[in-house]
């Protein structure tokens, strides 16, 4: 006890020692769904309907490149999945775990734009309790959700692990790190990552307690794939120090991207974001 900081002591005695409680306080802000999925009579084909709040930025032709379906997780929830065919000759598919306050409808335009610019297809999914997915968002469900997405990507589309880039943004780095620590892939990209829930809420926390949530810091050293970390230096939600700490623990780090002046939600608006991704996907992965 003598080695604990004041903030750690406060957390220890004031917060219930339960990862789920910490997670619910910190992490999950599911929006009202911005899309619906309608199934045909055969039960095998799903149609995506976007609401105005999805802010779709492309034509119906681009929308035809999006395939959606539902799959079941090991926890019994049915989650919505989205496969975006951005490029006919794409070597890699990004398995994209999005942030905590959006759903697939809101992300669909971003996926089209990103994939077409870096020549990758994109596979994504909604966490339990988000969008059309059933259940509730919890830490355990996050891990089951990404596992189900990984299995669907591999079995439904026949995509091999060496052609999958695991990509996580913000809270999405939590399922991404967990998956990448258990399965090898072409690469891992962590965009505005966190070290753990306690370390976000209490920045002076120096170690992982049994009741901490989202312990990326303890899992990242188990990742054997190349890891690219991207973080804004002025991140007001997850401090830049989290990206640095994770980078230092990587087995196979590549040159990170520290975006000078960027916050938590605008990294992708800086030109060097796309430049770094293009370089990583089209040049560096070939030689790794």
UniProtKB/Swiss-Prot annotation:
It is an enzyme of class 3 (hydrolase). Expressed in brain. Keywords: Cell membrane, Cell projection, Endosome, Hydrolase, Lipoprotein, Membrane, Palmitate, Phosphoprotein, Postsynaptic cell membrane, Synapse. Changing residue 264 to A: Loss of catalytic activity. It is a lipid-anchor. The keyword Nucleotide-binding does not apply. Changing residue 170 to A: Loss of catalytic activity. It is found in: Cell membrane; Recycling endosome membrane; Cell projection, Dendritic spine; Postsynaptic density membrane. The active site is at residues 170, 235, 264. Pfam families: Hydrolase_4 (PF12146). SUPFAM superfamilies: alpha/beta-Hydrolases. The keyword Nucleus does not apply. Palmitoylated on cysteine residues located in a cysteine cluster at the N-terminus which promotes membrane localization. Palmitoylation is required for post-synaptic localization and for depalmitoylating activity towards DLG4/PSD95. The modification Phosphoserine is found at residue 282. GO terms for cellular component: dendritic spine; glutamatergic synapse; plasma membrane; postsynaptic density; postsynaptic density membrane; postsynaptic recycling endosome membrane; recycling endosome membrane. Belongs to the AB hydrolase superfamily. ABHD17 family. Hydrolyzes fatty acids from S-acylated cysteine residues in proteins. Has depalmitoylating activity towards DLG4/PSD95. Has depalmitoylating activity towards GAP43. Has depalmitoylating activity towards MAP6. Has depalmitoylating activity towards NRAS. This is Alpha/beta hydrolase domain-containing protein 17B. It comes from Mus musculus.
């Amino acid at each position: 006890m003598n080695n604990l900081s004041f903030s750690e002591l406060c957390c220890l005695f004031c917060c219930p020692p339960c990862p789920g409680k910490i997670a619910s306080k910190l992490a999950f802000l599911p929006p009202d769904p911005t899309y619906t999925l309608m199934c045909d009579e055969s039960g095998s084909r799903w149609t995506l309907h976007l609401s105005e709040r999805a802010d779709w930025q492309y034509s119906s032709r681009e929308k035809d490149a999006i395939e959606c379906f539902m799959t079941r997780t090991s926890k019994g929830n049915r989650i919505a999945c989205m496969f975006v065919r951005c490029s006919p000759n794409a070597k890699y598919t990004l398995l994209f775990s999005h942030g905590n306050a959006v759903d697939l409808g809101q992300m669909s335009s971003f996926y089209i734009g990103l994939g077409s610019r870096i020549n990758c297809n994109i596979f994504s999914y909604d966490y339990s309790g988000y969008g059309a997915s059933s259940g509730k968002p919890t830490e355990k469900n996050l891990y089951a959700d990404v596992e189900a997405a990984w299995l669907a990507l591999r079995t439904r589309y026949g995509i091999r692990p060496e052609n999958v880039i695991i990509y996580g943004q913000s809270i999405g780095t939590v399922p991404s790190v967990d998956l990448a620590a258990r399965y090898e892939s072409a690469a891992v990209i962590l965009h505005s990552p966190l070290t753990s829930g306690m370390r976000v809420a209490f920045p002076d926390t120096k170690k992982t307690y049994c009741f901490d949530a989202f312990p990326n810091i303890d899992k990242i050293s188990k990742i054997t794939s190349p890891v690219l970390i991207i973080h804004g230096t002025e991140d007001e939600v997850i401090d830049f120090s989290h990206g640095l700490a994770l980078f230092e623990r990587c087995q196979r780090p590549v040159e990170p991207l520290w975006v000078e002046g960027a916050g938590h939600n605008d990294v992708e608006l800086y030109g060097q974001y796309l430049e770094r991704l293009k370089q990583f996907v089209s040049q560096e992965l070939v030689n790794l």
